[in-house]
Amino acid sequence: MQFPPASGSTQMQVQKLPTGIEGFDDVCQGGLPIGRSTLISGTSGTGKTVFSLHFLHNGIKHFDEPGIFVTFEESPLDILRNAASFGWNLQEMVEQDKLFILDASPDPDGQDVAGSFDLSGLIERINYAIRKYKAKRVAIDSITAVFQQYDAVFVVRREIFRLIARLKEIGVTTVMTTERIDEYGPIARYGVEEFVSDNVVILRNVLEGERRRRTVEILKLRGTTHMKGEFPFTMGTHGISIFPLGAMRLTQRSSNVRVSSGVPRLDEMCGGGFFKDSIILATGATGTGKTLLVSKFIEDACRNKERAILFAYEESRAQLLRNGTSWGIDFEQMEQDGLLKIICAYPESTGLEDHLQIIKTDIGQFKPSRMAIDSLSALARGVSHNAFRQFVIGVTGYAKQEEIAGFFTNTSEEFMGSHSITDSHISTITDTILMLQYVEIRGEMARALNVFKMRGSWHDKGIREFVITGNGPQIKDSFSNFERIISGVPHRVTTDERSELSRIARGVSSED
């Protein structure tokens, strides 16, 4: 038996058509297979129609590929109006003969259809439109409506299969939508739609905690590879945006340039400041001074004529301006100079994927050299651990990709003593961790600061007193006379104990 030459295998590989949908081509590793059909399945409101329209719109706008939209549900006028909400001028594309909307919606009078079911007429209309407009892409919305109009499921299945076979014969790339009942139940309502399609994509809109979370999953991509699992997505003002975190690569450059924290003593503790492209986390109980450190970080950027952006999820803009004034920081002047942008929003105002999209959009437009989020813990309220972890990875990955220094805060639940920073999924992602906490010394409450971690650099290991004054933060000497500060039960070291420790240290040194 003879095998074809190795070069023939390349020719036989499935070619892919880019959809142009942000993130989706990363998930399917290049796009949808050319000349094949893809089933877009989801419950009501998951974005199936938007996906199919986005597929056609991008084909026309970015790849000069005319498209045909076959509607079995909405009228062409409703489709044009709904698309306009995403900034898509489909009417202009229709007038330019780049897009044709074929209306196959049911008779509004609800008249019964007599005789046997046959799609021959519709198939010929689609075939004619494809030839006339030289279409490369076809979207059918939705085949569920066809099943609902006729009782003979096996006959409808046969006709749908005949339609898809004809489209495949013509060579167009087709997406068609179908409705399912449950988010994690059968793929399609009638249980046959997925068998007549080459590829299956599932859209979900699941209630997690108190919020809805949209995800996309490629269940089947026949003859080619794709990323596995669910990936979050959002529907914004420009359509669908998918966040394929699995496609992120650790290929960003690493800078040796340092930037100041805005607090000279803290810079000394960090070996000369933070790295330019590092992610810094300040974690501690409420009131320990996390927002103050963020403010000084932002102020230092603006003082050096660099742009900075602050995303605040716990305080209003007025509160931030007032608090900044009490520390001698004029945020309002920085805004007027065009060096600072402040975005304030309630975490519950939208989903995490939407917050991530807003962050990426604002950073892309403002182009800052530093960013800050105050705080991550506020965004974690009411969402699953997995959703929050993906959000943090998305934000930090984007910041590193853009070579932006990021300063985030996290509020710990414990008011006194040590607290875990691993439960928030961010301890291993961040480059520098500043731990702030309350300590009781001689019957008075004091604040302590420690550089808990600093990747790739020497840093001070001491636990130092952190004081907030009208002129900002002051970092004083370490609590050298105390131990067990981190545990929350500081113990004063006596003179005898200090002498003994010094003697032991000298003994170890002499043995070396």
From Swiss-Prot:
<keyword id="KW-0418">Kinase</keyword>
<dbReference type="InterPro" id="IPR030665">
    <property type="entry name" value="KaiC"/>
</dbReference>
<feature type="binding site">
    <location>
        <position position="224"/>
    </location>
    <ligand>
        <name>ATP 1</name>
    </ligand>
</feature>
<feature type="domain" description="KaiC 2">
    <location>
        <begin position="257"/>
        <end position="512"/>
    </location>
</feature>
<dbReference type="InterPro" id="IPR047222">
    <property type="entry name" value="KaiC_C"/>
</dbReference>
<feature type="binding site">
    <location>
        <position position="48"/>
    </location>
    <ligand>
        <name>ATP 1</name>
    </ligand>
</feature>
<feature type="binding site">
    <location>
        <position position="49"/>
    </location>
    <ligand>
        <name>ATP 1</name>
    </ligand>
</feature>
<feature type="binding site">
    <location>
        <position position="226"/>
    </location>
    <ligand>
        <name>ATP 1</name>
    </ligand>
</feature>
<feature type="binding site">
    <location>
        <position position="290"/>
    </location>
    <ligand>
        <name>ATP 2</name>
    </ligand>
</feature>
<feature type="modified residue" description="Phosphoserine; by autocatalysis">
    <location>
        <position position="427"/>
    </location>
</feature>
<dbReference type="InterPro" id="IPR047221">
    <property type="entry name" value="KaiC_N"/>
</dbReference>
<dbReference type="GO" id="GO:0042752">
    <property type="term" value="P:regulation of circadian rhythm"/>
</dbReference>
<keyword id="KW-0547">Nucleotide-binding</keyword>
<dbReference type="GO" id="GO:0000287">
    <property type="term" value="F:magnesium ion binding"/>
</dbReference>
<protein>
    <recommendedName>
        <fullName>Circadian clock oscillator protein KaiC</fullName>
        <ecNumber>2.7.11.1</ecNumber>
        <ecNumber>3.6.4.-</ecNumber>
    </recommendedName>
</protein>
<feature type="binding site">
    <location>
        <position position="447"/>
    </location>
    <ligand>
        <name>ATP 2</name>
    </ligand>
</feature>
<dbReference type="Pfam" id="PF06745">
    <property type="entry name" value="ATPase"/>
</dbReference>
<feature type="binding site">
    <location>
        <position position="459"/>
    </location>
    <ligand>
        <name>ATP 2</name>
    </ligand>
</feature>
<feature type="binding site">
    <location>
        <position position="49"/>
    </location>
    <ligand>
        <name>Mg(2+) 1</name>
    </ligand>
</feature>
<feature type="binding site">
    <location>
        <position position="286"/>
    </location>
    <ligand>
        <name>ATP 2</name>
    </ligand>
</feature>
<keyword id="KW-0804">Transcription</keyword>
<dbReference type="InterPro" id="IPR051347">
    <property type="entry name" value="Circadian_clock_KaiC-rel"/>
</dbReference>
<keyword id="KW-0723">Serine/threonine-protein kinase</keyword>
<dbReference type="GO" id="GO:0006355">
    <property type="term" value="P:regulation of DNA-templated transcription"/>
</dbReference>
<dbReference type="InterPro" id="IPR014774">
    <property type="entry name" value="KaiC-like_dom"/>
</dbReference>
<feature type="binding site">
    <location>
        <position position="291"/>
    </location>
    <ligand>
        <name>Mg(2+) 2</name>
    </ligand>
</feature>
<feature type="binding site">
    <location>
        <position position="288"/>
    </location>
    <ligand>
        <name>ATP 2</name>
    </ligand>
</feature>
<comment type="function">
    <text>Has a weak, temperature-independent ATPase activity; ATPase activity defines the circadian period. The phosphorylation state of KaiC modulates its ATPase activity and effects KaiB binding.</text>
</comment>
<keyword id="KW-0805">Transcription regulation</keyword>
<keyword id="KW-0378">Hydrolase</keyword>
<dbReference type="GO" id="GO:0004674">
    <property type="term" value="F:protein serine/threonine kinase activity"/>
</dbReference>
<dbReference type="GO" id="GO:0007623">
    <property type="term" value="P:circadian rhythm"/>
</dbReference>
<keyword id="KW-0597">Phosphoprotein</keyword>
<comment type="similarity">
    <text>Belongs to the KaiC family.</text>
</comment>
<keyword id="KW-0808">Transferase</keyword>
<feature type="binding site">
    <location>
        <position position="221"/>
    </location>
    <ligand>
        <name>ATP 1</name>
    </ligand>
</feature>
<feature type="domain" description="KaiC 1">
    <location>
        <begin position="1"/>
        <end position="243"/>
    </location>
</feature>
<feature type="binding site">
    <location>
        <position position="453"/>
    </location>
    <ligand>
        <name>ATP 2</name>
    </ligand>
</feature>
<feature type="binding site">
    <location>
        <position position="327"/>
    </location>
    <ligand>
        <name>ATP 2</name>
    </ligand>
</feature>
<feature type="binding site">
    <location>
        <position position="220"/>
    </location>
    <ligand>
        <name>ATP 1</name>
    </ligand>
</feature>
<dbReference type="InterPro" id="IPR013503">
    <property type="entry name" value="Circadian_KaiC_bact"/>
</dbReference>
<keyword id="KW-0677">Repeat</keyword>
